[in-house]
């Protein structure tokens, strides 16, 4: 697992709620980690250890702080590990909310807003992720969600995913860009077919097995239908 401390004098504590060594993955993945599968594996192992050691039997225990799970979930989505992200999301959804929808720091105690933004952020990032010039659809979709819809996701580059619907291998995304631009649209697997249903000036061109270059006009709703292999 990735280490928390530079000095060998300090031992990592996998039972602790903090995960400062996951900081590089809180919002996306740096290029040096993208290029190193072994490093990705070390980050993934840390998340697994934290979940197994600190968050085990979460249904019966109190005192665990919601922000720690948010951090693990954000890192898992950056790695594209859908099932690991889902493991983080389930207790986030079930443990830290009162009947009036107020969010808490510990299990049903201590009003706190960390999870109010953190839990939706993990969920959204599982379904839509973005970097400058890149929009990724369903980058960490768990098996528990074979179909679904999400609306109103704001992406980097002044792009909104107004609606994203998926059902098995069929994906439909409705996008609107505030400026004219070309972006790389990334699917969760190899693309069999893709089409642009509306949007004057919109066009797609080849890129990679699971991605296409998409030209977006300014201020126009563009519907993209994708069929995965």
Locate predicted features.
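Active-site core of glycosidic bond-cleaving carbohydrate-active enzymes
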Residues: 1-135, 145, 171
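Non-catalytic C-terminal accessory modules of carbohydrate-active enzymes
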Residues: 83-228
């Amino acid at each position: 697992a990735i280490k928390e401390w530079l000095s060998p004098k300090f031992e990592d504590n996998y039972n602790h709620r903090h995960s400062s060594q996951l900081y590089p993955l809180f919002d996306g993945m740096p290029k040096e980690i993208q290029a190193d599968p072994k490093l990705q594996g070390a980050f993934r192992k840390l998340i697994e250890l934290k979940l197994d050691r600190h968050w085990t039997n979460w249904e019966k225990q109190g005192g665990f702080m919601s922000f720690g799970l948010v951090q693990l979930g954000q890192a898992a989505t950056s790695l594209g590990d859908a099932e690991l992200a889902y493991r983080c999301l389930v207790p986030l959804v079930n443990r830290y909310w009162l009947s009036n929808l107020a969010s808490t720091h510990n299990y049903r105690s201590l009003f706190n807003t960390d999870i109010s933004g953190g839990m939706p952020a993990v969920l959204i990032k599982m379904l839509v992720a973005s970097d400058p010039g890149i929009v990724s659809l369903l980058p960490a979709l768990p098996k528990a969600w074979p179909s679904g819809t999400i609306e109103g996701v704001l992406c980097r580059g002044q792009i909104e995913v107004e609606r994203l619907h998926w059902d098995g291998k069929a994906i439909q995304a409705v996008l609107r860009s505030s400026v004219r631009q070309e972006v790389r649209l990334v699917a969760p697997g190899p693309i069999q077919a893709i089409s642009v249903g509306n949007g004057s000036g919109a066009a797609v061109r080849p890129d990679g097995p699971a991605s296409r270059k998409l030209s977006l006009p300014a201020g126009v709703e563009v519907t993209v239908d994708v069929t995965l292999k």
